[in-house]
Amino acid sequence: MIGGDTRAASAHPGMASAQGPVATPSPEQPFPGTTSVSLARPVLRVWHGAHSSGLLPNLIAQHSPAMAQNGAVPSEATKKDQNLTRGNWGNQIEFVLTSVGYAVGLGNVWRFPYLCYRNGGGAFMFPYFIMLIFCGIPLFFMELSFGQFASQGCLGVWRISPMFKGVGYGMMVVSTYIGIYYNVVICIAFYYFFSSMTHVLPWAYCNNPWNTPDCAGVLDASNLTNGSRPAALSGNLSHLFNYTLQRTSPSEEYWRLYVLKLSDDIGNFGEVRLPLLGCLGVSWVVVFLCLIRGVKSSGKVVYFTATFPYVVLTILFVRGVTLEGAFTGIMYYLTPQWDKILEAKVWGDAASQIFYSLGCAWGGLITMASYNKFHNNCYRDSVIISITNCATSVYAGFVIFSILGFMANHLGVDVSRVADHGPGLAFVAYPEALTLLPISPLWSLLFFFMLILLGLGTQFCLLETLVTAIVDEVGNEWILQKKTYVTLGVAVAGFLLGIPLTSQAGIYWLLLMDNYAASFSLVVISCIMCVSIMYIYGHRNYFQDIQMMLGFPPPLFFQICWRFVSPAIIFFILIFTVIQYRPITYNHYQYPGWAVAIGFLMALSSVICIPLYALFQLCRTDGDTLLQRLKNATKPSRDWGPALLEHRTGRYAPTTTPSPEDGFEVQPLHPDKAQIPIVGSNGSSRFQDSRI
């Protein structure tokens, strides 16, 4: 008879659980958990400790569909979710597009092409893809499987080993820093986007009030690198001095003297640039509205934000390759310098770019995967998303260097003279090149709209990471129903913290945060995550978890990478980062020592969470000796495992019958009324008697 059977003993000591009604899947059911089962007289059985474990809301939600996040009455889409408490993606395309939007960000456009040409052109592709295969994809798969198995954000997943929960807090700190300054970059892109809505781009000529005598526009003259100027000295004597003109482009002066009104020092904040402040507000409002219903709303938005940038890239590519000099720029980008492969710096740059561009150790991958259905094939997703991210970087290089080659040809200089990276490429070099094109405002609108969408795709996940971590950690019914208010609170806090970055010294602080807040701290966090899962929790346990979730264990290649290769590469990146460290500069400005010290404090603020929380956990863990406390603090908590009872099979299966003291009365099914409606994937249903 269906119901009343017992399952295998749990591997976690102290976990007591109840037997419950179990529905036998019909032949039409492709995966466990895809059939909706309801009982005429539902019986809710929980084990002792479920109240504090975070699993109780999930159990209640399975029997009480009226409870959903944000307090809304469940829609038809919500009713199809496996996890009614947290919700799931509407479909798997939404998850893939969101993850692509998260991984493919501004760095793919303004950092990778520059690294490629600086490190040997096409030869750089070899170490780049080697690092992708041995480090990027394995780490990506690990984080996706980690979040999907537990259906928890970057804090909740550390039930796997509570002593290392500080890793999750470190991820939250990193995401906070990045979310603050990343939206400022988006707001600047918004500003340029609005400024492009004109007949003549404001950075095209040197006849504006903010321009200096050194300004020389590419539309006014060409080949202005060298020049001569007569100067009269001592009465009748005149000399002709040949000198090098210090050309300042109108786009650079527009950026430095008009948009930023850049101060002379990081400590001289000056005034808040009100136009940038307004654009920052617009940016945060857009992010909040897109996340107002969590993944249910953002999952719909990414159909546009994650795909349209590829349309724009293709349009710019087609336009770029038709320009004179474009081939020279592309060859400069791709021509291999094979001797560079022997340089450690090239391999270090390749490893760092893979690591940072995929968004590993930010917490976003764990968070996005936590909204997947339990049996989703995240192995397939990790390969698709990682390769898409890297292919986008390579493709963006063609777009960037075709235009830069055209500008270099127009000016009569080498491509290296116009190539740049970071904000210098996005807001100075590329906008200047666009002024040379017919209908330049149109191309400018497309370019900055693409930057906005690329930035928003990453920003969505950064904000959702923080919100999900807070909601999962508190875990009570009130905060589950008020998740929208949590999202609003985080967005308002992010806006307020971003205001100093819109001041005249804002760009100094933005680059300081970019260089220190998410640099070596990410490497440390990722390394500790690998070690804690593979060697503290145990690689065999984790491989069994993945097999239970996916139906197959991780391939041998990934097992080897997780245990040996990827940690070694991460350690190499850490050593490389330390060896290659140089004090931060912006153009010719050298940051003062106190500013660099603040940068190091930002970097340490995320890493320090790990030992501090470990010490806290040791102090609150039972044990007669330090070794016993250490053992108890690192073993999985009893609520570690799949969030839903229907997925807690094998060593996670409930085994014992609870008593009424556990919080719920156990009532037997009435043999005449126990019917199970089996709902198929196409919406059809049939009733099956529970008796054999």
UniProtKB/Swiss-Prot annotation:
Extracellular side of membrane: 195-271
Modified residues (Phosphoserine): 659, 684
Transferase found in the keyword field: no
Membrane topology reported for the UniProt record: Multi-pass membrane protein
Cellular component, GO annotation: apical plasma membrane; basolateral plasma membrane; dense core granule; endosome; hippocampal mossy fiber to CA3 synapse; lateral plasma membrane; membrane; parallel fiber to Purkinje cell synapse
Assembly and binders: Interacts with EXOC1; interaction increases the transporter capacity of SLC6A9 probably by promoting its insertion into the cell membrane. Interacts with EXOC3 and EXOC4.
Protein name in the entry: Sodium- and chloride-dependent glycine transporter 1
Biological source species: Mus musculus (Mouse)
